[in-house]
């Protein structure tokens, strides 16, 4: 009988995952990860983990499976929280959920599970796994969840073959309503519980306040750039190589404060991210202002009016070689090769047609249509049909 450790988070998805595995004849152990209890950085004023670990315990009791709590707050702080601060400090916008899956759930947590004699680790993610044979070797595929509204394959875009080989996603073929229905039939305490939001396993987080505890506020200016600024109408040079063209298309525009008018003050450029409109606190404009760029060196935020301001859109992005990750290592591009894919630059974005171009120092992702708010530090993930085959950090 195969043994599976389920990461019980105290939510409905992982509860139903545990139940389904039990139905399939696995020996199931429930493990709750405690990821946070550093009082020096308060992340929010509620403490959901007590309630969550209690719900996880009640589910385990109801299913009659062994249950224990593991404290991963040290690893979490080192791998996730410090990474977030460092990224924000550099003016990049991290994605802690993607990292949490790679570094915590499918690494630290997985090692604990394997030390308990588990054959697999299961989570309540809406995604699927299948396997094929390539050159006589088993290759694992990361497939999107059947529920289009809930597909979470994007959050798993950094997993390796090794991690996938030991992972199970029992609810990947179900929709959210079906999952809730099973939980209700089984009278699981989590059946009606609403979905957790935000930072994986820490509950709700209010970012600027959380950041202010480590990154000191410093006042800077908010500058508005006109949509007709000449920076948006640069003539295309003739005779450029494909790589040079892609480089220009993916580059950050070089804004300077004197190009626009000062609209107000802010408390630190590193608290803002491209595409953001809340929190600018600038009045007196007919249309909403959006952040089109931040400059942490001069501590300036550049903004534009409306969500179709040209400063928000780009057709290409670059991923440095060290940050290109292939889930399907067998499909990895060699220098000079290209691949047509469907890609997304954020969770739940509808998939976009794009072409990957691999060069000596990294990869360009070139989209058929201009993309809004391509954000440094976020992950781009690429798919072949419904299979996520690779990802990278937008640089």
From Swiss-Prot:
Any one GO molecular-function label of the UniProt entry? tRNA binding
Protein's name in the database: tRNA-specific 2-thiouridylase MnmA
The UniProt entry's GO CC annotations, sorted and at most eight, read: cytoplasm
The organism's superkingdom is given as: Bacteria
Subcellular location per the Swiss-Prot or TrEMBL entry: Cytoplasm
What is the species of this protein? Flavobacterium johnsoniae (strain ATCC 17061 / DSM 2064 / JCM 8514 / BCRC 14874 / CCUG 350202 / NBRC 14942 / NCIMB 11054 / UW101)
Q: Where does ATP bind?
A: 7-14, 33, 124
Q: What is the lineage of its organism?
A: Bacteria, Pseudomonadati, Bacteroidota, Flavobacteriia, Flavobacteriales
Interaction with target base in tRNA: annotated segments: 95-97
Q: Family membership, please give it.
A: Belongs to the MnmA/TRMU family.
